[in-house]
């Protein structure tokens, strides 16, 4: 995974997330939408063949937090949820 920043302002961040596709892009988008300070978030894949694994994101916040902080919080939330799934899976296997 590689992040390439395209545009950065106080309450706006546009970036490419190289090496990912719709699976992670949807997860990140939905997790960002849960943050009340995120006013807009969306991604697009600009070309289905040439850029299939390089979604372009746009994140806009209300100015109370930066888009970078919103992304940091979303990443932590995704990690915590993945850990919950792993713990539940391990518990289910052990019976």
Swiss-Prot record:
CDD domains cross-referenced by the UniProt entry: RNAP_L
One GO BP: DNA-templated transcription
Reactions this protein catalyses: RNA(n) + a ribonucleoside 5'-triphosphate = RNA(n+1) + diphosphate
UniProt xrefs under InterPro entries: RBP11-like (IPR036603), RBP11-like_dimer (IPR009025), RNA_pol_Rpb11_13-16kDa_CS (IPR008193), Rpo11-like (IPR022905)
Taxonomy, superkingdom: Archaea
EC number: 2.7.7.6
Keywords: Cytoplasm, DNA-directed RNA polymerase, Nucleotidyltransferase, Transcription, Transferase
Cross-referenced Gene3D superfamilies: RNA polymerase, RBP11-like subunit (3.30.1360.10)
Subcellular location(s) per record: Cytoplasm
Enzyme class: transferase
GO cellular component, one term: cytoplasm
Pfam families: RNA_pol_L_2
GO molecular function: DNA binding; DNA-directed RNA polymerase activity; protein dimerization activity
UniProt function note: DNA-dependent RNA polymerase (RNAP) catalyzes the transcription of DNA into RNA using the four ribonucleoside triphosphates as substrates.
Subunit structure: Part of the RNA polymerase complex.
Similarity annotation: Belongs to the archaeal Rpo11/eukaryotic RPB11/RPC19 RNA polymerase subunit family.
Name of the protein in its database record: DNA-directed RNA polymerase subunit Rpo11
Protein source organism: Pyrococcus abyssi (strain GE5 / Orsay)
Name of the coding gene: rpo11
